[in-house]
Amino acid sequence: MALYDEDLLKNPFYLALQKWRPDLCSKVAQIHGIVLVPCRGSLPGSVQASCQFESYVLVPTEGHFQTLDGKAVVIEGNRIKLGAGFACLLSVPILFEETFYNEKEESFSILCIAHPLERRETSEEPSAPADPFSLKTIEDVREFLGRHSEKFDKNIASFHRTFRECERKSLRHHIDSVNALYTKCLQQLLRDSHLKVLAKQEAQMNLMKQAVEMYVHHDIYDLIFKYVGTMEASEDAAFNKITRSLQDLQQKDIGVKPEFSFNIPRAKRELGQLNKCTSPQQKLLCLRKVVQLMTQSPSQRVNLETMCADDLLSVLLYLLVKTEIPNWMANLSYIKNFRFSSSAKDELGYCLTSVEAAIEYIRQGSLSTKTPDAEGFGDRLFLKQRMNLLSQMTSTPIDCLFKHIASGNQKEVERLLSQDDQDKDAMQKMCHPLCSCEDCEKLISGRLNDPSVVTPFSRDDRGQTPLHVAALCGQASLIDFLVSKGAVVNATDYHGSTPLHLACQKGFQSVTLLLLHYKASTEVQDNNGNTPLHLACTYGQEDCVKALVYYDVQACRLDIGNEKGDTALHIAARWGYEGIIETLLQNGAPTAVQNRLKETPLKCALNSKILSIMEAHHLSSDRRPRPSEVPAQSPTRSVDSISQGSSTSSFSSISVSFRQEEVKKDYREVEKLLRAVADGDLEMVRYLLEWTEDDLDDVEDAISTVDLEFCHPLCQCPKCAPAQKLARISANGLSVNVTNQDGFSPLHMAALHGRTDLVPLLLKHGAYSGARNTSQAVPLHLACQQGHFQVAKCLLDSNAKPNKKDLSGNTPLICACSAGHHEVAALLLQHGASINACNNKGNTALHEAVMGRHTLVVELLLFYGASVDILNKRQYTAADCAEQDSKIMELLQVVPGCVASLDSVEEADHEGYVTVEIRRKWNPKMYNLPEEPLRRQFCLINPGGRFQERTSRETMGRDRSVPDLAGRSLQEPEKQRVTGKQSDLSDLSRYQTSEEGNKGLPERPVSRQAAPGHRPMVRRHTVNDAAILQVPEVTVHLTTHEASVPQS
C-alpha cells in the first residue's frame, strides 16, 4: 500500500478540472482513461483555467499512454516517464491510485503524482504534503505489517487468555494492560533492521504506531469495547434519554444553515459506520470523514464559503441527535483512553474535541426545541467555551503524574497513586467480588470507569511507566515507593529500554543500585541490542559500571554483544574510558571477543595508553591462574595491586574489646569494598556495607564500638544496641573491619587516599583506628605519609595512638617528617607524639627530615625540642646527615643554642609566650617563605618556665677525629626507600618489610644516647595563633658566634 494519502475530492487541481473542463471528465470516463492529479502539497496556489488539463488525461495505446494533446507517456512501476512532446523529460513518482465512477457508472482511474508535469528539472522539490500519512483499513494494516503480524498473534492470544481473569478490574487496569500489549508488539516490529532505519523519520514512525495499534485493537475489540460499554452503560442510558426526547428537533432549531443541509444525509450515513470501526484510529478517521463531508460543496462547480466553528458544532449537534448510535459515551471513552499512537493536537484530535464538546453540550441539557431567536445567547457561548477548553486540555492524568515524579514531589505522587487503593477498598466492602446488588453498584460506580485514575503500570505515548521517569530523573526516593506499589522493574518502553537502562545512561548510581536490589535484569537488551552496561560504558558513567559489576559479577555478563557485536569493553576502549576499562578487566571482561567487523577490544583502543593497559592485562591473565584455582589463603603475598585485583583475599579479625569478627568471603567482595573506598564512592560503600539512611542519621549520636565492651556478643540492651547496629556484618559478609590479604581495611584505604567524608563514617560505624596491616601500619601511618591533614586530625580526635610503630619502627611522626608534611607533623606534636622516637635504623624524625632536606620540618622539630645529638645505628647524628654550608646545617647549629639560651630568661608568668622570631636574629634573609607555619606563635607548655640544667646523661656527638669506616660520605648519606612494583601502589609498598638494610649493623652503645623519655628538655612549644596580641615579644640577642655549636 502507499505511504501517502489524501482526499482527492478536495484536491484543488481535481476541483479545478471539474469546474473548468467538465468535458474532459466525461471523456475520460467514457474511454476508461487515467487522470493525473498532482498532490495538494505540490501545488503553488489556486489552479487557473489556463492550465493545460489535456496533458493530465491519459489514453491507453499500444505499449504506452498518450495524452489528449498528443504527448507520449510511459508508466513503469510506480513512476511516470514523460516522452515526446514535453519540454522536460521528467520522471514523476506515483503516490497512490484510486478508481472513480460517474453518474452513469462509468469508471476511470486517478493517479496522484508527486508534482505537476510542467515542473522543470532545476526547480525545487515539492514540500511535504499537508496531510499526515495514515492507514485506513485493516487490510492496509496487514499489508503493511506483512510477516510481523504472525508474531503479534501470539501476544494477542496470550492477552485473550489472561483477560478473563481480570475482567472485573478497573478501567485503568485494562488501559495499562492494552498499552503493555501495544508496546510489546511495537518493540517486536522495531527489531526489524529495515524498519528500525525508517523509524528515524517521524512520519514513518507514526505510521508504524498506527499499524500496530489498529492491528492489536482489531483482534481485541470485542473484549475491550464490550467492557467499556459495560462501564459506561449508565452514562449511555442517560445520554440516550436526552437524545430520544429531542427527536422532533429540526435543523432550523439549532441554526444549521441551508447550504450545509445538502451534505447531512451523506454525513449521517458515514457516521452510522462508527460502530463498525474496530480501533480508535478508525473511529477517528470516520469522524474526520464526517467533518469533511459536511464541508464539501453540493456541486463540484460551486464552492461553499468556509465553515466556521459555530456552523460545525450546529451540524454535529444535529447528527448526534438524529444518528441511531446508542453508545456515544462508550465510543467517546474508548477513543480517548485507548488511543496510544497519536497526539491529541493533530487533526484527528481536533475532530474528537469537537464531538466531545457537542456531546457535553447535549448532556448539560442546553439543547432544546426552541428557535434560535428564543435560545439564550449564554447557551451558545457555553458551547464555544467548552470546545475551546477541551482543545486546550492537552495535559492528561499520566502527564500530571510524570511531571510530579520528575520534580520529586512524592506527596503528589502518593496522592495520585492512592486513588487505585480506594478501588481495592471498595471491592473489599462488597458483598462478594461478583455482587451486583444496588448497594454494591453504588459503591463501585464512578471509580471503576474513572480514566483519571493512574497506576504504576500506566504508560505515556513513549511507552514509559512511572518507574522509567523516576529512573530517568534520578528520583531514588520514589523508586522504593513505586516498587512497593507494584511497579514492574523490568518493564520496557517502545525502544526496549528498562528503567535500569535509563538510570545507567544518565549516571544515577543510587537509582541503579536500588533497581538491582529489586532484581532488575542486567541482561535485557533494547532495540539496538544494548544492555544497561553498554549504555553506562557509552556515556562514560563509571559509577554505574561499578554498580552493575560489583553487585554481582556472575549475574552481570561482560561478554554480551549489541547489534554491532560490540561488548562493553569494545565501547569503553573506543571512547578511552580508562577507569571503566580497568573495572571491566579486573572482573573478567574478555579481550579476545570480536565484533561483527572482526575487531577485538584491543583493536578498538583509542590510544596507546588504553592499548597498553589491555595488553598488560591480557598477558597477565594468560599467566595468572583463575581465582577458583587459588587457595583461600596463601602465605605469600599477592603481586597484583588492589586496582588490578588480588589473586585472593582473606578476612582478618581484629582482637580488641569488642567481639571478634570471623568472616569467610570470596576475595572479590573485599576488593569491591576497598576500591569503592579508594574512589570515595560513598553510595557504593553504603550499598556494600548495607548502611541505610537511618544509619547515617544515627552516627551523630552513636557510641563508638571501639571503646565499648558488650555485655555479651549478642546483647541488645539500650547501652549495646546502638553499637551493635553500627558494627553489624552485612548479608554479604562485609564489615567496616574486614581486610584483604595485605591487611588493608576500609579505614586504611580511606586514610591512604584522603577520603575525609568516609573516615568519620567508618569510625562511627565501628572501624578500629588501631588496625594494622601486614606491615604493622595503622591508618594514621598512611594518612601522615600522604599528608592528609584532615584525615589525621579525625583519627587523632578519635583517640588514635600517635606513637605506634610499624614493622620498620616508624611512628606516624617519622612518616610525616620523612615526606616533608610539616602541618601534619605539627598536629602530631600537639597530640603528644614522641619527638625523639627512633625507627629500626635508629633514625629519629629529625634524621628523616634532614635526609629529606625538608627545611620547615627541621625547624619545627628543633623548636619542639628535638635532640640533635642522637646517633642512629650507623653512628650518625642529624647534623652528620646534613650537607655542609646548607640552611639545614645552620639551623642545626644555631637553633639549639637559641632555645638553650631561653633558660636564662626570667619570666614573671610561667605561662608566657615566646614568638618564634629567633631565626630572624641569626639570619634575617634566610626565610622569606610564604605561609611559614613557624611564624605563628608558640606557647611554652611546661609551667616550670625554664629548661633544666643538662645532666651527666647529656648525649654526646661522635668524635669527628675518628675516621669514617662506613665508607659513606657524611655530607651525602643515602636514604633507603622501598618502591613497589606497581606505580599506583607506591604508597602501599612503602610499608612492606625491608630488613636487608639493617642486617649486620652493630648495636650502638647505650651510654652514647639517652633514652627519649629522659630528655633534659622539659618544656615544649605548641602553636597558638591567638596569643600573638596577648604577650609581648621576648627578644633574644644572639650572635652567630655565641650560638654556634662547639666542635669536639
Curated annotation (Swiss-Prot):
Phosphoserine found at: S961, S969
Which GO CC annotations does the UniProt entry carry? cytoplasmic vesicle membrane; cytosol; early endosome; late endosome; lysosome; melanosome; neuron projection; plasma membrane
Question: Impact of changing Q509A on the protein?
Answer: Disrupts interaction with RAB32 and RAB38; inhibits peripheral distribution of TYRP1 in melanocytes; no effect on dendrite formation in melanocytes
For this UniProt record, give its keywords in alphabetical order, as a comma-separated list: ANK repeat, Cell membrane, Cytoplasmic vesicle, Endosome, GTPase activation, Guanine-nucleotide releasing factor, Lysosome, Membrane, Phosphoprotein, Protein transport, Repeat, Transport
Compositional bias of kind Polar residues: 979-995
Q: What is its main location?
A: other
One GO term under biological process is:
early endosome to late endosome transport
Region annotated Required for interaction with VAMP7 sits at 658-707
> Which subcellular locations apply to this protein?
Early endosome; Late endosome; Cytoplasmic vesicle membrane; Lysosome
Region Disordered: what ranges?
A: 618-650, 949-1019
> Where do the VPS9 domain residues begin and end?
233-371
As for what it does, the entry says: May be a guanine exchange factor (GEF) for Rab21, Rab32 and Rab38 and regulate endosome dynamics. May regulate the participation of VAMP7 in membrane fusion events; in vitro inhibits VAMP7-mediated SNARE complex formation by trapping VAMP7 in a closed, fusogenically inactive conformation. Involved in peripheral melanosomal distribution of TYRP1 in melanocytes; the function, which probably is implicating vesicle-trafficking, includes cooperation with Rab32, Rab38 and VAMP7.
Annotated protein name in UniProt: Ankyrin repeat domain-containing protein 27
Provide the species name. Mus musculus (Mouse)
Q: From which lineage does this chain's organism come? A: Eukaryota, Metazoa, Chordata, Craniata, Vertebrata
